[in-house]
Structures are given as structure tokens and as C-alpha cells.
């Protein structure tokens, strides 16, 4: 009876989007923390908040979480200065509301390298912070499953 329950539970859990078991596997990747600070608003896909907000001091360095290539470095009215980096194993990291950008599209970056500075830019900002998103194979994933903030 217990074996049957366990099998049924495991079958159900593999489709559970909030389950830690649904975290994509990573081979040998060591993720850097994107900036110093505390999470002020966590990832919540149900509320369409596809990242973690990290309260930080303006001007604090924003770091690439992994080696990669900058695929977007721009300004938008809603999210202010933002930068996106493509990484190995189909990961993309997104950094929004920056005060300034230090890298351009096409630049190669190392994990832990400064790519921007924390700011308060864009209409959707709520004060100095970094809105950080992590995407894997085109789907938003909870950064807190990979990075210790």
C-alpha cells in the first residue's frame, strides 16, 4: 500500500510547477549572487512576478550570475535600464531597474563580473532594487532554487 501511494505521489509531483523536484537539473554550474541585498518581493508565477526583487543600495554592483553573452542592453519606460545575458544550458538571466549599464549587446561576461549598477529606473520601480529573473528553456524559474541570496 505504501509503495502504491509513493508511486502515485511521485507521478503527481513531477507535474507540480511549484515542486522543488521540477527544478531543472544543472551540470556543474555555480551561480553567483546578482547583487548584495535582501529579497523584498519573491518570485511568484501565479501573480505574474517572474523574478525576485532584491532591495539594495543605489550604485551597488550588479553581477553576471554565470559566464555568458549579453543579448540585450537597453532602456524601457516600464523597467528602466535592463540587461539580459544568455548562459550555457539554455539559461537566460534578466536584470531590471538598473541605474546604469556597464555592458553592451554582444559583450562576453564572466560569472561574478559587474554588468550594471543597482538603481531605481522605470515606471514600475518601487525604490532602489534589482528585479532579477532567471529563465530556463523559455520558462521563468524561481531564482531562489539556484542562488543563495
Annotated model-derived regions:
Residues 1-42:
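Polar/charged, compositionally biased leader and regulatory segments
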Amino acid at each position: 500500500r505504501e509503495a502504491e501511494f509513493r508511486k502515485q505521489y511521485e507521478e503527481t509531483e513531477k507535474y507540480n510547477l511549484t515542486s522543488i523536484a521540477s527544478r531543472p537539473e544543472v551540470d556543474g554550474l555555480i551561480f553567483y549572487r546578482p547583487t548584495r541585498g535582501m529579497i523584498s518581493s519573491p518570485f511568484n508565477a501565479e501573480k505574474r512576478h517572474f523574478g525576485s526583487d532584491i532591495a539594495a543600495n543605489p550604485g551597488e554592483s550588479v553581477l553576471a550570475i554565470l559566464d555568458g553573452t549579453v543579448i540585450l542592453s537597453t532602456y524601457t519606460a516600464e523597467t528602466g535600464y535592463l540587461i539580459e545575458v544568455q548562459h550555457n544550458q539554455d539559461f537566460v538571466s534578466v536584470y531590471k531597474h538598473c541605474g546604469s549599464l556597464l555592458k553592451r549587446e554582444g559583450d562576453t561576461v564572466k560569472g561574478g563580473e559587474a554588468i550594471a549598477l543597482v538603481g531605481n529606473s522605470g515606471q514600475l520601480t518601487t525604490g532602489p532594487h534589482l528585479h532579477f529573473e532567471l529563465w530556463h528553456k523559455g520558462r521563468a524559474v524561481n531564482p531562489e532554487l539556484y542562488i543563495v541570496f
